[in-house]
């Protein structure tokens, strides 16, 4: 993330012509995922996205520019170009920046991004192996884990200075029962905005058992009566 001083330089540049308001929006996203089929890893990946948006307003006129390059000098030039493009006739001063306020959407005890993928694989494999050994009718087990972390920073010419971080996790386990040419599934896919403590506390074996029972019950169920 950019420092307060560099963000203020960007806002000063944005307000240097006719803008009566300017704000800077910075967003950083991280994600990690892993998927298993019958206990074998079939996909694993991570991603990182970072970008900044600069908005200038003069009355009802708005100019918005954005970039994924957080070089301060380049962003100052971008803000100056936006200021040149904005139509208006006012000249406002920039208020002193507030102390940065950090918030988190939920109480995170263990950052999921700090967990190695091997631990995620071991967690999912435990569910997959249980499902495959539960009953001969269960012929396939699919499991996945996805986590994402989003940090947003908003600073404006009125002195606002806020930053918020949110974290999300979703796991999914699916058991497939087969009988002849017919297949039926049982599945659970809980999501949370907690940290990795959610995974440590989750009764994955109990839930996997429920998935298997659902799939087996469905495969033996008759058709609903018509009429």
Q: Where would I find each of the regions flagged by the language model?
A:
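Active-site bordering "gate/hinge" segments
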Residues: 1-227
